[in-house]
Amino acid sequence: MAYSEKVIDHYENPRNVGSFDNNDENVGSGMVGAPACGDVMKLQIKVNDEGIIEDARFKTYGCGSAIASSSLVTEWVKGKSLDEAQAIKNTDIAEELELPPVKIHCSILAEDAIKAAIADYKSKREAK
């Protein structure tokens, strides 16, 4: 199986690796895993007062496709509203990275991580 140039680029030069303080009320965190392959993905978003994602970070333990999916998604969500970020689908990620069918689950993880981070952010805001 050969990886696409985009997967290789995001794997060798991942964007936005790291984490934010989870106690920050403007940060939403999503942690998801895939029992099928052991990949674990943590994705965090930082949202400004206007409801726009101003920054994103990730830490992923997994294959090149999982790391590339995380890296790509953190780039995509920056500058988007929560609704726009929520609308990102795994098929968009898989298509952009040209993932082979056996690696589609990596793009599903990335979509799930975005949704989990948004849900976490919203639950923090509602708790105020």
UniProtKB/Swiss-Prot annotation:
Changing residue 90 to D: Stabilizes apo-protein in the D-state; Fe-S cluster assembly 3-fold slower than wild-type. Carboxymethylation by iodoacetic acid blocks sulfur transfer to this protein. Changing residue 89 to A: Stabilizes apo-protein in the D-state; Fe-S cluster assembly 3-fold slower than wild-type. Homodimer. Forms a heterotetramer with IscS; each subunit of the IscS dimer contacts an IscU monomer. It comes from Escherichia coli (strain K12). Gene3D superfamilies: 3.90.1010.10. Changing residue 111 to A: Stabilizes apo-protein in the S-state; biphasic Fe-S cluster assembly 7-fold slower than wild-type. SUPFAM superfamilies: SufE/NifU. It comes from the Bacteria. The gene is iscU. This is Iron-sulfur cluster assembly scaffold protein IscU. GO terms for biological process: intracellular iron ion homeostasis; iron-sulfur cluster assembly; L-cysteine catabolic process.
